Each structure stands twice: as C-alpha cells, then as structure tokens.
Amino acid sequence: MIVWLASYPKSGNTWVRLFLNSLLNDKTNEVDINNIQIRQFPLRYDFSNLNINMDNIQEFISNCIVCQDKINLDNSIKIFKTHNAFWKAGNNQFTNEENTKGVIHIVRDPRNIITSVKNHFSRKNYDEALKFMTDEKKSLGSRTKKKIQIC
C-alpha cells in the first residue's frame, strides 16, 4: 500500500523525506540527500514495461493505477513523494483507494508558498503566481494543463 507524501513544490517535501528516511530506513544517523529511499512517483521507470506514449496524458493517466498495482504486489507499505493531486483525466484517476494507505499532506504558510510558486514556475509577479495557483485547470507540478509531473 502507498502512503503519498503530497505537497506544492518548494513546501519542504525533501526535508520531510530526509526526516522519514532517517527515521524508517537509515540507522547510521547520516543524512545523504542523494540517497533518499523515498522516491518520486511517477517516474518514467515505473512505466518502462508498458508500451505507452508518456506525452499522451490519457495514455499516461490510464496506466498510473496499473503501475501502482504492480508496486503493491508485495502488500508492504511504501512512501512516495508526489506533486500531483488526486485528480481524474477523463474516466481515469491518478490513484485510487485500493492502492492508497494514506496521505501526508505538507502544507506551507501561503505567504511563503506564493513566493516559491512565483519563482518555481517563473511567473512575472505575485498576481500571476496567485492566478496560476487558483486555476482549477492547471495540474500542480506541470508547466501546461496537459502534462503532469513525470521525472
């Protein structure tokens, strides 16, 4: 089962992953930002055995749950970082209750996050950043409304 570590970009997700990684996995008390066992989902690797066009949002989203089903075959709890929301594209969802054990939702003070969104998404000013943040047609973590964040 998957526990999602979900947040806006620049909200402390990496810090929380380092903390959880140290708590759950790393007994050496050494923190290595380049060796965090809690990784991003989705990665292109997750879809490597599927013959799909990763740039086609419908093909991609219709296979997210297929990939999560494979990840969950051993029934162990896994934590994945994501900037994607619990959303649908057509009749397909990013995830579902069968694959999800829970969510850790990192929330940052909105007075700080608008600055991060402005810089992260290269918005010209705070008004443009606010418009981007409140646009229901935008997919968090994407540069356009037709793509989601895939690493």
Question: What does each model-identified segment do?
Answer:
Residues 1-151:
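PAPS-dependent sulfotransferase catalytic domain
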